[in-house]
Amino acid sequence: MHTLKETAKKHLSFLCETIENRCVGSKGNLAATKYFQEQLEANHWQIESQEFDAFDWESEKAFIETETIKLDAFSSPYSEPCNMEAEVAIVSTVDELEKASARNKILVVKGELAKEQLMPKNFIFYNPDHHKKIISLFETSGAKALIFIVNKSGAYEGGEYPFPVVEDGDFKIPSVYISEETGEQ
């Protein structure tokens, strides 16, 4: 018989290491849901599943390129694709974002604005007002694309880093994210 610690480690290993992507609608999400359902049923739990339509999304290689550097980046889950050239504006606080002249620019987002993942704008279960405000400011900024330099101090201990700040199929501004270390280049 396995100890509780061994059992928990087995489940977490499968859900976090074996399945790398659990974004809603992805093959990994469906595999994780099936695995969880099987574990509950094996322990004689009665379950109900509520099905809903969700689209799958896959990212190709993403990068940020200037005349002098080329940086590998990660596409934000569900991001629209893009290939563009534009001037850059940089913001790190809500106040700077409110005052930014970002129309038709690529907005580099760092600091306070890149320390936590923002809830999807139409997520009804939990969506703090400050997240709604930031998303709204991005959408009304006129920015052509967003580059998030993810704040390492915002990463959860032992969690994914860098992590996507935006993971929202309803958010239509193309975005990528990179680590602070990559952003220093």
Could you tell me what each predicted segment is?
Residues H2, E6, K10-L118:
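Noncatalytic luminal/extracellular "stalk/propeptide" segments of secretory-pathway proteins
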Residues I173-Q185:
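Long, well-ordered, tryptophan-enriched scaffold segments
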Residues A73-E167, K172-P174:
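Extracellular/luminal Protease-associated
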Residues K10, A31, I47, D129, ...:
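Conserved active-site and cofactor/substrate-binding residues in soluble primary-metabolism enzymes
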